[in-house]
Amino acid sequence: MDLIAQLEAEQIAALGKEIPDFKAGDTIRVGYKVTEGTRTRVQAYEGVCISRKNGSGIAGSFTVRKISFGEGVERVFPLYSTNIESIEVVRRGRVRRAKLYYLRSRRGKSARIAEDANYKAKA
């Protein structure tokens, strides 16, 4: 293992976060800490993961898209952000692409993603 990968592994271990195995096409629920004045609360943001960048390293991020009041909303979350309380996989999607940017131009039934019924987690 080279020096940079070793430093990354140490930083990830120091954070002590458990990141579930998810990919583009999966519907996920992100518990994100929101600070309003002096109060801090956890806000759930649920949508389809349309991309993952930089894998599962310390600099990794993922984009979640949802339709809110008829308008498409996307948020990019850093994978190891201290503001992320939890990441939960709601359902597994079956897609053939790593980046689902084509969903931006689709609405309704054409934007649906088939559920992956026989998903096998990596060992």
Curated annotation (Swiss-Prot):
Keyword check for Nucleus: no
InterPro entries: Ribosomal_bL19, Ribosomal_bL19_CS, Ribosomal_bL19_sf, Translation_prot_SH3-like_sf
MF-aspect GO terms: structural constituent of ribosome
Pfam families per record: Ribosomal_L19
GO cellular component: cytosolic large ribosomal subunit
Keyword annotations from UniProtKB, A to Z: Ribonucleoprotein, Ribosomal protein
Source superkingdom: Bacteria
Keyword Magnesium in annotation: no
SUPFAM superfamilies the record matches: Translation proteins SH3-like domain
GO biological process, any: translation
Gene3D superfamilies in the cross-refs: 2.30.30.790
Described function: This protein is located at the 30S-50S ribosomal subunit interface and may play a role in the structure and function of the aminoacyl-tRNA binding site.
PANTHER family named among the record's database cross-references: LARGE RIBOSOMAL SUBUNIT PROTEIN BL19M (PTHR15680:SF9), RIBOSOMAL PROTEIN L19 (PTHR15680)
Family named by the database record: Belongs to the bacterial ribosomal protein bL19 family.
Protein name listed in UniProt: Large ribosomal subunit protein bL19
UniProt source species: Ruegeria sp. (strain TM1040)
Taxonomy of the source species: Bacteria, Pseudomonadati, Pseudomonadota, Alphaproteobacteria, Rhodobacterales
Gene: rplS
